[in-house]
A protein has these predicted regions:
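Bacterial N-terminal signal peptides
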Residues: 9-17
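Immediate post-signal-peptide N-terminus of mature secreted/exported proteins
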Residues: 25-55
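Short secondary-structure capping micro-motifs at structural edges
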Residues: 36-37, 74-75, 104-105
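N-terminal, post-signal-peptide region of Sec/Tat-exported proteins
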Residues: 45-79
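Extended amphipathic alpha-helical interaction segments
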Residues: 83-106
């Protein structure tokens, strides 16, 4: 097969790749921000997630973390709700630090 005959296929393939929607992976429950948040909650160390937010947002993250840790101790349902609250807060602040809007966890 001649190299020139592959060009149309390569061009079409590139067009499909470029047209694919790009999602913000950091918004995902399986993304790096929420993964770090899970680790932080399980270890009790809020410093593990501070790399994901701007310095100006660290106090809000620490407050949300402390609230989540306190509520997690109540029962399994409270734990799930507290975790979700912390994930939402962290991802929202992370996206704001990137200058992007927050549209919820994916």
């Amino acid at each position: 097969m001649r190299p020139r005959s592959l060009f149309p296929f390569a061009a079409i393939g590139m067009a499909f790749l470029m047209a694919a929607p790009v999602a913000a992976h950091c918004d995902g429950l399986d993304g790096p921000v929420v993964t770090a948040a899970r680790t932080a909650l399980d270890s009790g160390d809020p410093n593990l997630v501070l790399i994901w937010v701007q310095p100006r947002d660290e106090a809000e993250v620490r407050q949300a973390f402390a609230q989540a840790i306190a509520v997690r101790k109540l029962n399994a349902q409270a734990r799930d709700l507290a975790d979700r609250y912390f994930f939402e807060t962290l991802v929202r602040l992370h996206r704001a630090g990137e200058g992007e809007t927050y549209t919820g966890l994916k």
